[in-house]
């Protein structure tokens, strides 16, 4: 029995051993090293191609010769991926060398961009067009579309001048083209309808195109001189319904804040200022001590009014967007709703906005397509009111009010300076409320006729906008001796109705190697704008703030009505031979009711050509084609117009309210008088643009870029013409000015991959612009009061050059004659240079006529951006840097001058001022004294001008997308979380505590709202 058991165990052991051997043999036959070579179609080896065994983490990359080797089983699928090429899968079927040929991803070559009245392949563009996609905007969860564009595209200047809730940004394309009231705003079209760039939620945008030259923009004629921005909203797609929800939550704080001295130091340096002026000190030592120890805060306070005001609000903001997309074989749709709420850094300040978007595309019959677009918003802005009547003004005067003035005292009263007390006004029932609503709707029918390539398009659109604004300033209690009143109420209401109709025909035909595209159309636009305003004061209490509650005897009112129309005919011809030689001609004929008969019609043509050098046989056969796969040279010229000059400026203007005596005996009769001489000859401003560009891509699309040179010349700029005062009245505008902008744009992008999972993209852009005034009215070479000189940029700073400060009395005695007599000069004062005289050489005295010069310009010479993005497995990181440079700024008033008009003193002024014990010629601040606007030291000079260039870390975002294997378990297709920072910090040499991008007042009534940094987080869900 025992032997039998031993025999059975031996048999089992041998069986197991045999099975192991067989298994090993089978494994050895199926598991082996797979060797391969990866090349492109020309046979060139591709380096760094990712090779991954599907369903595993087993992978490798190709070496310098395009070769790879890895272990795999027979039947395994290898996933091959490479930037610029179509990913593919290859089955392991033998141990022979795998030869894999990668197919170039033609998506880049087939990429289309939105242009005027259509789309165009990017590689076939002959104009200067930049594009921003939904993905570019997604990494910047900002409240404003305009703010999201900063640094994204060459030729685009974006300035965020305020952090006020709901505030957008100023957008310019290729410099400042005019100094007239026609303005520099680009034409913005949202799904083909005229609008504002912030009318649409950034989450609802599919793409934005910037038409920068005449070739791309002339199809819009006399509205396109400042460039055109085309916004396309998101559309639905065929397939199952998808629901997407995104949100963000964030907090704001100022990017910069001035460092004001506390009350005891304020008193100390105020005494110094008094001594420097030969006056008695204002504060005794025991008073300064009371300010320091805080023992009597009502009478000896220490209040930083600016900091208090900017910390009175929560600064919390949140936004949400929910969209539903879907469709079938004939119909697709997109429905989106959005909500955002931004609480200000100051209390009672907020912006609440609700948006809705609906788009639909449906084939209602064979060859007949219907497109519907509806976009709407409701916007509500709230802010405190006071003296002056805006939150910006309140902040400006909080800059002025020193720490020696109390906030709210223990008895409930308020400290104040004149009529200014942010604490009192914020506690009052005063308010500003602005409510605006807008709905934009369009319908388009497209008939693709039985004739191949021929289509007809009809489109109607309507935009209705309304607003209701209310500003109430209550009777406001300061203390027993001061109440500001009476209460006042201003109400404004307005509405605008804009309608448009378009009819277009397009035809596309290819004859052998010749491709033709034709477009012809006409459009009619009408605008009707109505306004009404009313005012009353003296109300029974602070809670009845309706016009009917005010004193009827104080009532005033006004109304307005403006209408204009535009009739246009336009066309475009595109020709291409083998997609190698490209030609485009645009023509638009506009008639505008804004001008007088005989001057209403204008022709706006453009022509452009392109040469795709990379399509030439000699290029394809050259070795360089293996590196440079796309190379195109293009050039364009055309003329654009700017009709945005107001309504009917050619008409004679009469002013009512002037009585005249009539009859015998003479009695006064109601009448009017002619206020201005009209000019029926005026017409639109014209901008001629020359553009030469180069587009290229290398390394199979991994590295691409564009280079552009442009020259813009704007003529017939509208400006008033000076006439003799003997005429007794004003003269209307005339086409008398000219401005030029010459520049270079560079845009580069590199997309790379390291290993299997690490992807990155680097995209810098740079724009340099030389702006110059070319012509002024009456043949003048300068208009100093308007800061304009022929040959200089718009917005010059005109003033005195300085030679530091007077060090001592000996230097004062030896100095040339300054702006004041020597008896009024002191050591530590600004020393102005004598640079010229009547004969063009220094004449021994400084005066305004001969010794002022151009100190700089507020117009930037260059702007740039750097976009960085990376992803590793589920993690992603993006960063955006934005900068402007080559310009200067001058701020004054309470922001720059210590003790100005009873204002404060900042730490840098106190610590860096000229002192008798340390008489520094180059001290950052002059001799400390109390100041007002007419002081000698405060003349516009290079002493006060600062370099306003800056480099800002505009946005950083870090996100994580959860694996689909996880999210599908909870019924979600995609889940992403992120943290983000906006306006994180900047590098600049501007005034300490002040942001160079901020719009800051310079006069005795300054106003500003600090630009804000935003720290946020959010979630994206896709169902």
Language-model features: where?
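Small-side-chain secondary-structure face that scaffolds active or pore-lining regions
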Residues: 344-353, 375-388, 436-438, 446-540, ...
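Surface-exposed loop/turn segments flanking beta-strands in extracellular/periplasmic regions
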Residues: 266-301, 390-425, 470-488, 530-557, ...
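Extracytoplasmic gating/loop element in the C-terminal half of outer-membrane beta-barrel translocons
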Residues: 295, 592, 884-976, 981
């Amino acid at each position: 029995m025992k032997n039998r058991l031993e025999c059975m165990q031996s048999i089992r052991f041998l069986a197991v051993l045999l099975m192991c051997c067989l298994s090993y043999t089978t494994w050895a036959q199926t598991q082996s090293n797979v060797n391969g070579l990866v090349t492109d179609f020309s046979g060139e080896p591709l380096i760094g191609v990712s090779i991954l065994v599907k369903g595993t983490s087993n992978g490798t990359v190709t070496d310098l010769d395009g070769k790879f080797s890895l272990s795999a089983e027979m039947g395994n699928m290898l996933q091959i991926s490479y930037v610029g090429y179509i990913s593919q899968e290859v089955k392991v079927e033998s141990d022979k060398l795998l030869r894999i040929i990668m197919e170039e991803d033609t998506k880049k070559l087939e990429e289309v961009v939105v242009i005027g009245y259509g789309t165009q392949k990017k590689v076939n563009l002959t104009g200067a067009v930049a594009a921003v996609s939904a993905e570019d905007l997604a990494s910047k969860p900002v409240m404003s579309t305009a703010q999201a564009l900063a640094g994204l595209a060459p030729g685009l200047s974006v300035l965020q001048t305020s952090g006020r809730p709901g505030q957008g940004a100023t957008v310019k394309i290729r410099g400042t083209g005019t100094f007239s009231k026609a303005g520099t705003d680009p034409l913005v079209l949202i799904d083909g309808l005229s609008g504002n760039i912030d009318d649409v939620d950034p989450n609802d945008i599919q793409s934005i195109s910037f038409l920068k030259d005449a070739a791309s923009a002339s199809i819009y004629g006399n509205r396109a001189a400042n460039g055109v921005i085309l916004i396309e909203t998101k559309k639905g797609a065929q397939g199952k319904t998808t629901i997407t929800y995104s949100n963000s939550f964030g907090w704001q704080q100022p990017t910069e804040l001035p460092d004001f001295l506390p009350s005891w130091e304020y008193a100390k340096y105020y005494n110094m200022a008094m001594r420097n002026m030969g006056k008695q000190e204002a504060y005794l030592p025991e008073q300064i001590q009371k300010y320091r120890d805080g023992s009597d805060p009502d009478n000896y306070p220490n209040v930083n009014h600016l900091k208090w005001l900017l910390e009175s609000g929560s600064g919390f903001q949140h936004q949400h967007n929910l969209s539903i997309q879907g469709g079938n074989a004939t119909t697709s749709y997109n429905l989106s709703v959005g909500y955002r709420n931004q609480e200000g850094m100051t209390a009672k300040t907020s912006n609440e906005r609700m948006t809705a978007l609906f788009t639909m595309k449906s084939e209602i019959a064979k060859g007949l397509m219907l497109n519907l677009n509806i976009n709407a918003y409701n916007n509500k802005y709230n802010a405190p009111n006071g003296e002056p009547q805006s939150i910006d003004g309140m902040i400006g005067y909080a800059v002025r009010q020193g720490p020696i003035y109390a906030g709210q005292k223990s008895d409930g009263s308020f400290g104040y300076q004149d009529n200014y007390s942010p604490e009192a006004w914020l506690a009052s029932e005063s308010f500003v409320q602005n409510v605006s609503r807008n709905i934009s709707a369009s319908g388009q029918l497209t008939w693709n006729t039985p004739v191949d390539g021929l289509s007809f398009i009809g489109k109607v659109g309507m935009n209705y906008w309304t607003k209701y604004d209310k500003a109430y300033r209550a009777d406001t209690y300061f203390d027993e001796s001061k109440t500001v009143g009476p209460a006042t109420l201003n109400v404004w209401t307005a509405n605008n109705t804009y309608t448009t109709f378009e009819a277009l025909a397009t035809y596309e035909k290819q004859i052998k190697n010749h491709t033709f595209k034709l477009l012809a159309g006409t459009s009619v636009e009408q605008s009707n704008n109505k306004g009404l305003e009313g005012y009353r004061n003296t109300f029974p209490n602070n809670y009845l703030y309706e016009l009917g509650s005010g004193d009827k005897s104080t009532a005033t009112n006004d109304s307005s009505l403006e209408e204009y129309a535009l009739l246009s005919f336009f066309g475009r011809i595109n020709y291409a031979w083998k997609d190698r030689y490209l030609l485009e001609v645009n023509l638009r004929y506009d008639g505008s009711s804004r001008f007088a008969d005989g001057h209403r019609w204008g022709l706006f043509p453009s022509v452009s050509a392109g040469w795709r050098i990379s399509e030439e046989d000699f290029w394809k056969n050259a070795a360089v084609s293996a590196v440079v796969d796309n190379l195109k040279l293009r050039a364009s010229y055309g003329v654009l117009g700017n009709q945005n000059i107001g309504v009917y400026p050619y008409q004679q203007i009469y002013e009512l309210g002037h009585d005249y005596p009539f009859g015998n005996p003479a009695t006064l009769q109601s009448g009017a008088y002619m206020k201005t001489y009209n000019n029926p000859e005026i017409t639109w401003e014209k901008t001629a643009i020359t553009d030469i560009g180069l587009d290229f891509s290398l390394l199979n699309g991994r590295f691409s870029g564009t280079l552009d040179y442009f020259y813009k010349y704007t003529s017939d700029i509208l400006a008033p013409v000076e006439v003799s005062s003997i005429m007794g009245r004003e003269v209307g505008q005339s086409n008398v000015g000219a401005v030029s902008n010459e520049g270079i744009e560079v845009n580069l992008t590199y997309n790379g991959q390291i290993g299997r999972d690490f992807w990155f993209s680097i995209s810098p852009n740079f724009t340099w612009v030389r702006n110059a005034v070319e012509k002024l009215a009456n043949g003048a070479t300068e208009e100093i009061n308007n800061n304009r000189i022929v040959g200089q940029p718009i917005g010059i700073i005109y003033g005195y050059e300085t030679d530091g400060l007077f060090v001592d009395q000996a230097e004062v005695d030896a100095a040339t004659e300054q702006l004041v007599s020597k008896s009024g000069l002191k050591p530590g004062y600004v020393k102005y240079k004598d640079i010229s005289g009547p004969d063009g050489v220094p004449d021994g005295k400084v005066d305004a006529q001969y010794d002022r010069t151009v100190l700089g310009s507020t117009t930037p010479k260059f702007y740039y951006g750097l976009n960085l993005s990376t992803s590793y497995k589920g993690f992603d990181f993006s960063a955006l840097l934005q900068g402007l440079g080559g310009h200067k700024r001058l701020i004054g008033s309470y922001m720059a001058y210590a003790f100005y008009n009873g204002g404060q003193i900042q730490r840098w002024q106190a610590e860096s001022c000229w002192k008798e014990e340390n008489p520094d010629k180059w001290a950052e601040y002059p001799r400390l004294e109390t100041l007002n606007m007419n002081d000698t030291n405060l003349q516009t000079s290079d002493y006060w001008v600062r370099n306003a260039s800056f480099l800002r870390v505009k946005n950083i975002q870090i996100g994580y997308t959860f694996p689909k294997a996880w999210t599908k378990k909870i019924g979600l297709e995609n889940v992403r979380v992120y943290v983000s920072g906006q306006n994180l910090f900047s590098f600049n040499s501007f005034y300490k505590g002040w942001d160079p991008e901020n719009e800051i007042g310079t006069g005795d009534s300054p106003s500003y709202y600090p630009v804000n940094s935003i720290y946020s987080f959010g979630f994206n869900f896709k169902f």
